[in-house]
Amino acid sequence: MEMKNMVVGLFLIAAFALPALATNFEKDFITHETVQAILKKVGPSSNGMLDEQTISALTGKTIISNPVLEEALLTHSNSINALGGTLPCGESCVWIPCISSVVGCSCKSKVCYKNSLA
């Protein structure tokens, strides 16, 4: 009986802890430089006001500035993108689409890449 209680307890812990843990690992991010590029591109045409959808998307992403994380993403993008492999937009698109589409980026393999034709 004691073993059964331990197994049930383990399943209860897993049921509540694992979904919260998974959401921390798959959060979208955006770099400070990308936010600045978006604001520079959008700002003058709209008198400094962003639309509600853009504000919601920006607040849903985690701003990063860690050079180690950026270097890891650059290394990872080299293996995915055989045509260039640079860190083009500094943004992920796991859950939220590329906000940097304003500056010519699109989503590929959960990372926003710059369209070379734009």
From Swiss-Prot:
Cycloviolacin-O8 is a cyclic peptide. Expressed in leaves, petals, petioles and roots but not in runners (at protein level). Disulfide bonds join C89-C105, C93-C107, C98-C112. Residues 1-22 form the signal peptide. There is a cross-link at G85-N115 (Cyclopeptide (Gly-Asn)). Belongs to the cyclotide family. Bracelet subfamily. Probably participates in a plant defense mechanism. The presence of a 'disulfide through disulfide knot' structurally defines this protein as a knottin. This is Cycloviolacin-O8. It comes from Viola odorata. The lineage of its organism: Eukaryota, Viridiplantae, Streptophyta, Embryophyta, Tracheophyta. The gene is Voc1.
